[in-house]
A protein has these predicted regions:
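N-terminal, polar/charged subdomain of small-to-medium soluble alpha/beta proteins
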Residues: 2-132
Length: 132
């Protein structure tokens, strides 16, 4: 059965979990227009993490992704990056997520409100979660 699922035996014995951070708000410089380069705008992020950890069995924070710390890292990185495009912001966040060894894959959606007149919001999604 393990070979059929193409999952390493060690990973199978550990827990497989989908963690989601929804509605993470980050105020940062984002956009191409001159006026966007001088004032912060709000981005809203939805992040899915496919993790392989023991937290479902152990009930210990040390056995999973510390999503409070991850949220802080994401916020700091986007503030520092001053991206011009939401597509780039999604990639920046994705790279932070997969740097954690417990994260097998990640999917990041970045939404920017009021990007274009008569449009409620624009969003970009980067990454995949296996099996979705």
């Amino acid at each position: 059965m393990l070979r059929t699922l193409n999952i390493k035996e060690e990973e199978y014995r550990r827990g497989n979990m989908l963690l989601e951070l929804n509605g993470l708000e980050v105020d940062c410089i984002i956009g191409e227009l001159p006026e966007e380069r001088v004032r912060s705008q709000r981005l809203v992020l939805d992040v899915q993490l496919d993790v392989c950890d023991d937290s479902a069995f152990s009930d210990e924070l040390a056995d999973t992704v510390d999503y409070a710390a991850l949220a802080d890292s994401i916020r700091s990185a986007l503030i520092a990056a001053e991206c011009r495009m939401i597509e780039r912001a999604a990639k920046v966040v994705h790279d932070i997520c997969i740097a954690d060894q417990k994260v097998r894959s990640a999917k990041v959606k970045v939404t920017k409100s009021g990007a274009i007149k008569h449009l409620a919001s624009a969003s970009a999604t980067y990454g995949i979660i296996a099996g979705q």
